[in-house]
């Protein structure tokens, strides 16, 4: 039987964290690295002491991240050795196949590649440094920061927005001029064609 636990905190090596998705937005990671670098040593310690990475324990007791992949990657790139995690569920009694099925059905996994295509569970990287860039995930994050849509608790909401933009903004436009693509995406986000997406804020009045 699946064991749900009361959240408990423990320090874990960043290098040992296991992703539950294939992609992140490298632009998002760069912004988080800037935020970390702007903190004094004291404030950085306080930040790490209050920002916990939520994980689910899998086979062999490994820590599988179910959120904050961008922060975990930023910490890795900044040379942070360990971080506190919050253990939300203990599924360590399951074999690998059953574990992945449970994660998938609990919306604790996003096995989609940088083209928005679903991939086998085996394609999910084994460590945060192997996560792949999806520029449209960065675009979705930028549009949210600009007020294009509201933060929403729907699992992987930003990836739904990323897929929406992927179908409407060419990769060449996004690659050549991120700011221009962001302005176009902001316009799209406020149109009624996006009203099915989590956090949609209505048309621009």
Language model: regions and residue ranges:
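Short hydrophobic beta-strand that contains or immediately precedes a catalytic carboxylate
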Residues: 64-67
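Cys/His-coordinated zinc-finger cores
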Residues: 73
